[in-house]
Regions:
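N-terminal amphipathic, basic helical "cap/leader" segment at the start of enzyme domains
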Residues: 1-118, 222-246
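Small-aliphatic-rich amphipathic alpha-helix that forms the alpha element of a beta-alpha
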Residues: 34, 38-39, 109, 115-177
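Short glycine/serine/proline-enriched coil/turn segments at secondary-structure junctions
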Residues: 43-46, 157, 196
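Short secondary-structure junction motifs
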Residues: 47-50, 163, 185
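A glycine-rich helix N-cap at a beta->alpha junction
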Residues: 73-84, 180-207
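Generic beta-strand structural signal
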Residues: 105-107, 161, 184-188
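Alpha-helical transmembrane segments and their immediate juxtamembrane flanks
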Residues: 200-226
Length: 246
């Protein structure tokens, strides 16, 4: 039974929620467990690689959500209408973007950049102003690992507790940083199921979307796309996991 429970939670955490029941509040006990999970995840030599900002205030969550108009609508057919490459990076056409309702949730966790308790030689050197580009890159990668491990652990425990979860890494950094006061790296939303198709945007209707990307009638909620993951696993460098279960 415990294996099926874990697998069910994994399946929930893999598929993000696009709408939540905002009339409910997360209990203090559950919130404490979620925070404990996020801040006690494994990291290299137990260094501190991020600062965690937690928001339960609906007004602040709304402001965070307003920073996320970065979800791009495009197909290969309309690709050139959507993106433009510049020296400062790729710029997307705002007319083909929507806010990410994965994090218009009951509680929001924002992972922000932080460096503390550094113990490894490379990490200490990377934290100095004259560090090489390679050393800085390696340290940033380690910090990204820590955020990834923590957020994955957080999402899984949220699912075990019966909640739905969502992620957002595309947002306006300056706008969000004005709220968090630290450089934001990743947003995780956790909340209650809204008893509707998880892919439906909580606020955007098809009439708000360019015609070529509408998913139904004008008065229906616009539906996010969904994709399946294909991952090959080998056991001991040879046996195919799917056909040779241990």
């Amino acid at each position: 039974m415990k294996h099926q429970t874990i697998k069910k939670a994994v399946d929930v955490a893999q598929r993000t929620q696009r709408n939540y029941d905002l009339s409910k509040k997360i209990s203090k006990e559950d919130l404490d467990t979620l925070i404990y999970t996020a801040i006690n995840s494994p990291s290299k030599q137990n260094e501190t690689h991020f600062k965690l900002k937690v928001y339960t205030d609906p007004n602040l969550i709304r402001k965070i959500y307003d920073c996320t108009k970065r979800f791009s609508l495009f197909t290969r057919e309309y690709f050139n209408k959507m993106f433009k490459d510049t020296d400062k990076g790729v710029i997307a056409n705002a007319n083909y973007e929507v806010k990410n309702s994965q994090i218009l949730s009951n509680v929001v966790f924002v992972y922000c950049d932080d460096e503390d308790n550094l113990r490894g030689g490379e990490q200490i050197i990377a934290n100095k102003g004259n560090a090489s580009e390679y050393t800085t890159m390696k340290f940033n990668r380690i910090k990204d690992f820590s955020i990834g491990i923590s957020s994955g652990q957080l999402s899984l425990v949220g699912a075990i507790l019966g909640y739905k979860t969502g992620y957002c890494s595309a947002f306006s950094v300056p706008e969000l940083q004005s709220i968090t006061k630290n450089e934001p790296k990743l947003i995780v939303g956790i909340g209650y199921d809204n008893n509707m198709d998880r892919r439906l945007h909580s606020e955007i209707f098809n009439r708000d979307i360019p015609k070529e990307y509408r998913t139904g009638a004008d008065d229906e909620h616009w539906k996010f796309p969904s994709f399946d993951k294909e991952l090959k696993v080998e056991i001991n460098n040879g046996l195919d996991y799917e056909n040779n279960m241990l």
